[in-house]
């Protein structure tokens, strides 16, 4: 089936799909204080979703394109779940978040199909994949339209990889007690086996969201990147997130000696947000297999254990946490009790001496990850490094931080 036909088959106009903001039915929803963070964007009034401009632009989306799609959503007069929230249009139709972003992605997909130049076509496919992922954001369990957008994002990503520099391999890893998981191995030009970074992404992102990280930072240094979806989303959707948050990544890490393109003696892990929970767990549990662990805006203790901090976090992010934990009908109190068990300090790991070199980068006044969080990680390591990232100018400082982190990883892998 062609890509265009697949899009048409998946996205027939329907109006009975459950609207995204209603999928998690938590009680005690409160008012949302204004909030902004570099990695998560900000909660803009009258939007259910956090508008994550920095990360979307970093992935290659033009700021004007973001505004154009937002304008189409705002201007829609279709029925909404909540009249006060623009992005709650019911059904797959004009004004619906998934519809408008998927429509934008299909335009780029069409351009990719018509483009004769392989490199340019690859760029268009990659852009389509990014837009499909934004359509599916925040990737809540049971969101049928979002799952269809994810399928198209993965297909577009595979098309892009065939045309862009280096090579990409889709790999399947067995996990005892359940379904296998699919990972993408991104390899730079040259002969392997390559030093490799195991990417541990945030809970509201897909593994295909990190191509920019590979292309701009790892590939120029001859480092491969292995990505894997977090439990309960994408290719890992059959796995629920548990207190053993690193389970899937741990099995992949153990299997790397059998992957001929990876130098399993030179592997590091890099965790964004909750992905740092996975990466730091691996630093303790799999120290002999890891040369280094880097974290950015880590969520390993404070947000998971402090009710006051949780009360400042936007509803969408709490919905993401509840969705990943399979707690779609939970009260905030029940969610807090469960989240506390995910704290690596409560689990008895963080605070103990760890032989793995660990770096952690933080922004001051980050609502998701205070400075103490990163300091706890780096002081627990026998070779720790702490990086404070100035907020403004946000894009340039984000790039500088990633360059510094990549150099640190490279130094420990090579």
From Swiss-Prot:
Substrates-to-products reaction catalysed: a carboxylic ester + H2O = an alcohol + a carboxylate + H(+)
EC number(s) from the headed UniProt entry: 3.1.1.1
Keyword vocabulary terms for this entry: Hydrolase, Serine esterase
Broad EC category: hydrolase
InterPro entries cross-referenced by the UniProt entry: AB_hydrolase_fold, FrsA, FrsA-like, FrsA_esterase
Pfam families with a match to the protein in the record: FrsA-like (PF06500)
SUPFAM superfamilies in UniProt: alpha/beta-Hydrolases
Record-annotated disulphide pairs: none
Superkingdom: Bacteria
GO function term, MF aspect, one: carboxylesterase activity
Physiological role: Catalyzes the hydrolysis of esters.
Similarity field: Belongs to the FrsA family.
Name of this chain's protein: Esterase FrsA
